[in-house]
Amino acid sequence: MSFIHPLADPCLYPLAHQLIPILSSTFEEEIQFAIGVRQLCRKYNILFIADEVRMGAGKTGKFLCSDWLGPENKPDMVNMAKSITGGSYPASYILGNDDVMGPDMIKPYETGSTFCMAPAANIATLTALQIYDEENLLQRATDIGNKFAEITKSWKHSFIKYVTNRGADASIYIKPGNVVTPRRIARLAFQRGVFIYPHGERLRIGFALNITDQEFDKGMGILKSVLDDVESYGEIPGSIHEAETPEQ
């Protein structure tokens, strides 16, 4: 389904792209793909919008994912939400360069929304930005990512396809057709005190940027124990797999 605004300009063709989705096995592959998309948009005069709702606000080690593309590949617009306040209060923002949102393009009272002046959202955003700077959370995201990569490179579980991360956000891809599934791993981890999100063939792991080293080490230890033990389990409450379904 799609919606076309009755006042939409038929000559305006924007492209919104989540630059770093952690779907490839390497960070560099996603960066190069995003650069290629951005350059195609520039070549054909297509508005390029960077979707930073989930992966923006420092998670990858830079404040914006688009920062990884280099200054010559900046997007025309950026949309942010969710992570911009550290999850403390709902807020969303649209950023744009002068060619798209400058004073010659948008006049007073041409934009607005019901909650655009929500004081709580504004304060939550400003406070989160202050904490990012004071606690050097961009560097912390990089440190978390490096530590995660160092720990997981020695994991040799036969059902793991590959492990990859972008700063403090990570994915563990599971080979299809196994008794071991992302959902079974996630449910067993949940019982042991660690929440990870099963999504398709992968486990998505998002580390809080203010996590302590002790909390990180404890969580990674639990995750490793789950991966070591999961093949020996039959039924895992909350998980659904043919291996758990009793024969009729």
Ranges and model annotations:
Residues M1-S2, P6-D9, P14-Q248:
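Conserved N-terminal phosphate-binding loop of PLP-dependent enzymes in the Aspartate aminotransferase
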